[in-house]
Structures are given as structure tokens and as C-alpha cells.
Amino acid sequence: MADSGDKDVSKSVRFDKESIESKKRSSVDDSASSYSSSSSGQDRSEGKRNNVKFSTEDSDDEDGNLFSRMIKNLKSNGGAGLAPGLSKANSNQEKTDLEDNDNVVTGHSDDIPMEDFTSEAQNILQGHSNLTPAQIEALNGQGLSDIETTASSTDLNFLAPAIDHFDDFDGDGEEENDGFVDTHGYVAPPTQVRGGVLGSLLKLYQEQDNATIETSSMYSQSSYGESTANLMSIDSGETEVPSEHKPKDHKNVFMRSGGKVAGLAMNAPGQIYGHGSKAAGHIYGHGRKGAGHIYNQGKKGAGHIYSQKNKLSSADLSTEGLKKSGHKAKKVAGKMPKLRKRMLAEAKITVHIAELLQRQRFILRMCKALMLYGAPTHRLEEYMIMTSRVLEIDGQYLYLPGCMIVSFGDATTRTSEVQLVRCTQGLNLWKLHQVHGVYKKVIHDQMGADEGNIEIDRILREKNLYPPWVCVFLYGFCSAMVTPYAFGGHWINLAITFFMGSCVGMMQFILSEKSLMYSNVFEITASIVVSFCGRAFGSIPNSNICFGAITQGSLALILPGYIILCGSLELQSRSLVAGSVRMFYAIIYSLFLGFGITLGAALFGWMYKGATNEISCGYPISPWFRFLFVPAFTIGISLINQANWTQLPAMVFISCTGYVVTYWSGKHFQNSTEFTAALASFVIGILGNLYSRIWQGLAVSAMLPAIFVQVPSGIASQNSLLSGLQSANQIVGRNGTNAVQTVDLSNSMSFGITMIEVSIGISVGLFASTLCVYPFGKKKTGLFSL
């Protein structure tokens, strides 16, 4: 009988173990499948709960396709002129762009406030942890206050092998010789990357499941031992059981009769109703042969489990209570190490998730800042890859004009989280210099990701150095300075150009900020007004006012030189999508300007029959005075693009050197715009790279004003901006209809073709200069160069 009972108990224990194992496997499989299937959506929801989200501009859902959205995005960027940083980057209607300023690139209402990601990560874990608040408080009382210091986020359990896409930029090809400025900019791919949030949560579930299995097996073994001991005591026929061996649960006492359960305790302790012919009627009594009824009035003491002589005194009861409470305390103390271990594991995962969110946030914020402040677009992806390598983040990046698609991978779960960083691209030389400083400190491990986030947010919140009304007058000043050296204007033309340039600046910085509808037609209206007024001033008799000089000088700062330069650099860097879209938009932009000039000149010619037709100036200024206007224009264009006064000396020196090369090479190579621009940009690139290597400056900010000096000079050498004047004269002529048909169609495209020639020459010269400074610079990659 006893042997059969033991077999039954062992079978039940094995059944309990098997059921626990099956439940464990099913719960783990269900949790893994549910998390892997909804990883991207859950990650985005977690990101929203942690305020890890990034402002985007209004989606162009009404546009028909991706290509049209790219064109419209470029149109709204306003980065086509020589002052792309303030074209329309500070528009008040674009409130979703990290900008909330008085025409300043600063942080905005949707900006992400700095928060303690440790608490946010703890909130994530609390939604998935199975610890009760009482257990957490008990563990905190046992000395878990040092969790933050003992938990290490560098545990290898949180690292995963790096996947293959990190090697995309290490192939043996032409990019190996693409050496650049910074001697420490290159970062080797990490051997291990940090796991994602989803992988950390799944690891938390695995720890909890293991703890559940261990606890269940421990409880099953203890219950098996207790039940066996009780049954053996019954078989031995003991009449009295000490208080410490009494069953704890009086409502679940098994009685065996022929190996089967014969009775169940239903009432208070001390009374048992049993059935059976040979039931052991007295478990704690004196009668050993009680037949049938436990309560038998005819036999003394047969109905009482505890007789009078076995009754416990009050002292015995108090002693028994103390023993029970002590036993419970020992049991809780035995569980403490396991719970403490689980809490430490959760603390490590919390710290890991917090640091992971901080690093991902830094990558996205730095990407936003680089796009806002004019980092070289053809190397944006490389900046982000180098940063993610240093931070041990598994990231992939795809750049489109005005948009960066970021994918954070989790190698442990084979899932990824996609973020879209979209903003208006501009140019801010001083803030770009500051962002570059933060970037250098982070990749050289001189600054953590959390400190980098604070610095980036501070830079985004800062106002521009110069307000819009100052930029309006600087616009007129730059227009006046560019007229003599680039377009051959006389002294009297400076005042007219200053007035007209200020009008263009007011249209750009004031009117475009007030109306979104007007900002879409700013270029056309500005060219119409400038052409109309320029021909009107040039038609004044004996005034020596040159129509061509004042018109081209007033429009010099909205020429699409910068955007064509970025497009040509992207195409040369094999960024086909971004380069093609940007180049095509620049051609259309040039046609807009040409159409506006033609229309404005035709309108005035229709109103006044004696309108001037002169394109070139008959009284040019002395060539030696031109060298005085180049540094003045450089200072003006640098201040418009928010350069600090400490950056001006290097900018002026490089710009003047480049113009000297342009001037003297133009004397020897007639009608060769692209070759002249290539020589000048080659010298500019060498000086900028040397400045960055020797004085540890930022090459791109030092070279951009010098590049802006080259664009008007190249345009003026062909007079292509006024190619529409012939069409305007023929439109208002008597035989206008027939004359227009004989006009060569190449005249309308000559301005765009000239711009492309100049930009191609500049891009070739810049790439050649980097090869000259860093002939073997694969692992000395300075990224912030043109």
C-alpha cells in the first residue's frame, strides 16, 4: 500500500514538472513571436512613450509620387542661392522643423526635452516585469540602493556580433583614395554592437522564465518530501505528532485506503470525517481501531483528535506561533538571493536601455543638426556611420535631399526600427563649427552621448548671431560689393545695386517668412522686379548706369550655385539619387531665373520704347580695385551665413587667394569657365585642407565663402544671365511673333548650362585637392571637407 502511494505521488510530481516545462516553452515562444512580429510598431510606440521622437515637416501625402515630393521638398528648402542658410530655413510656417525663432535656427515647440532615460527605461521594464511592488520594496530595504553603481551596461550579454553592412564602406575601390581633412576621423567597424530595446526585453523575459522554472521545481520537491513524510508517519501508527510536524494546511490532508484517497478534511483542525472499512480513524487520537465514525460517543476519546491531556496551553500556542513566523521569515530570506539577482538583472537591462536610447537620440539629433547647418551632403551618410561605430549602434542610413532615413537594427532579434529625419537644409557656419566640435569629442570618447545630447540641444536653442533685419542690409552690401569685381560695374552702380539688393533681401527674409504662397514664387518675382527696375535705371540718359551689372549683381546671392555644387559633389561621390534630383532641380531653378529676367525686361520694353539694350558696361572699374571688393564680399557673405568673427581671417585669406587664381588664369584661358573654376577650387581646397590639418579648423566653413566668390565670376564670364534680353527685345518688336520663332532655344538654356559647367569645375578641383593633401588617406578620413 505504501509503495503504491509513493508511486502515485511521484507520478503527480513528474506531471507537475512536465506541465511547468510545457507552459514555459509556450510562453517563451508566444512572447518571442509576438515581439518579433510587432517589433517595428512596438518600438515606435515605445519611442513615443519615451519622448524619443523627431519632428518632421508636413507630409506631402497629396503628391502623386516620390519624385514629385523630392522636387517639392527641394523647392521648400530654399537652399539654392549663395545664402542657403537663410533662404527659407527660418520660415514661421515651418514650425515642425526644430525651429521656433525670430528667423533663427533654434529649438522649437516640438523639440524633445532632455529627460532622464533611466526612469523611462525603468517604466519600460515595469510594464514587463512580474515582480510585485511589495517584493521591490522588500528588496530595496535589503540594500539594493547600489543598483545604479553595481549594474554595468558594458556586460557582454547586451552585445551582439556586428552584421555585414558595416563593411560596405571598407571595400577596395576608388573610395580608398578619397582622403580628407581629419587625421582621426576614420573609425574601424566594431566587432560587437549593442543589442536593441526589444532584445533586452526578451532577455528580461528569459531571466524571469528561468527563475519561475527553478522556483517551481524547488516547491515541487519540497511538497513531495513533506507529503511522503506525513504518509510514512501515518503508516507507522504514531498516536501523537509534535507541533512542529503538524501539517500546515489542515484543509488538504490525504487519507489512504487501499492506495486511494478515502477522506478529505473539510472542517476545523482536529475533526476529520473518514469513510472505509479499515480507515485509520484516529490520526492524532488514542483509539487505533476506530471503525467508521470519528465521532463515537460510546468510546472515550475516540472522537477527539486532541484529548484533554494533549491540549496545548497558551504558552505552547504562543511558542508555536513564533516558530511558524520564524519559519516564514527563513523561507522569505531564502528567496531573497534569487529576487535580488533578478532585480540586479532588471537594473542592468534598465541601464542598458537608457544608454541605448541616449545613443540613438544623439545620432538622430546630430543628423538633424548637420542637415540644418550645411554639412557636406555627399558625406552625411559617412558621418552617421562613423558615429554609430563609435557608439556601438547597429545603424544603416540612406540620404535623400532634405531627408535622412535611419534604421537601427537589433542583431539579437533580427528586427529594426526605422526613423525619418526630415528638415529644411540650410547653412549656418558658426553652428556647423560647434556641431563639428561635439562630433569630434564624441567619436574620440572625450564626451558621452548624454553630454552630446545636451550640447546639441543647446546649439539648436541658440539664436542666430545676426537677426533678419541685419541680413537685409548685408544682402544689399554684398550685392554692391560683387558688382564691380564680377560684373564690371562702375562706382555709380554700387548705390543702385545696394538698393535693389536690399529689396531682394527684404523679399527673402521678410515677405517669404510671412506667406508660404509667396515663398514658392520668390525667385520668379525677385528676378522680374530686379530686371524691370534695372532696365529702368539703365535707360536713364547719360547716367552711366549699367543695366547688366546692376541686374546680375542684385541677383547674385540667389544664384543656384550652392545647390549645383552639392549636386555635382554627390554625383561624383556616387550618390546618384540625391545628386540627380538636386542637379535637375538646379536646372529648373535656373530656368525660373532666366524666365523672370526675360519677363521683367520685356515688360519695361513694352512700357518704354527707348529702353536700353546694353548688356556690358562701357566704363568698367579699374581691375586693381577689384581686389579690394573681394574681401569685402567675402566678409558680407560669411556674415549672412552666420559666421563668427573668429572665422573671418581664414575665410578672407582663402577667398582672396582663390580669386587671384581665377583672375590670372582667366587672362590666359579665354572662354574656358570650367577650367578656370577647377584651378581656383583646387587652390581653395588645398588651403582649406591645410588649415584644417595644421590649425585644426573646420575645412568646409573656411572654403564655402571662397566657393561663393567663384560662382558669380564664372557666370559673368559668359554673360549667360542676360541671354533672355534678346528674346525680350524681339517680343516687344513689331515682328515679335516671327522673331521669337528664329531665336535659338539654346539661349534659354545657356544660363543653366553655364552654372553646371562652373559647378563641375569646382567639384573636380575640390576632389583633386583632397587627393593632393591626403594621397594615401584611407584611414585618415577627415569627413568635414568638400
Swiss-Prot record:
Chain positions covered by the region annotation Disordered: 1-65, 77-103
Membrane topology according to the record: Multi-pass membrane protein
Composition bias, Low complexity: 29-42
UniProt subcellular location: Membrane
InterPro entries: ThrE-like_N, ThrE/Ser_Exporter, ThrE_2
Bilayer-spanning residue ranges: 469-489, 491-511, 521-541, 545-565, 584-604, 620-640, 645-665, 675-695, 697-717, 751-771
Keywords: Membrane, Transmembrane, Transmembrane helix
Gene Ontology CC entries for this record: membrane
Composition-biased stretches (Basic and acidic residues): 1-28
GO molecular function: transmembrane transporter activity
Keyword Membrane annotated: yes
Family the entry assigns: Belongs to the ThrE exporter (TC 2.A.79) family.
Protein name: Pheromone-regulated membrane protein 10
Organism of derivation: Candida glabrata (strain ATCC 2001 / BCRC 20586 / JCM 3761 / NBRC 0622 / NRRL Y-65 / CBS 138) (Yeast)
Lineage: Eukaryota, Fungi, Dikarya, Ascomycota, Saccharomycotina
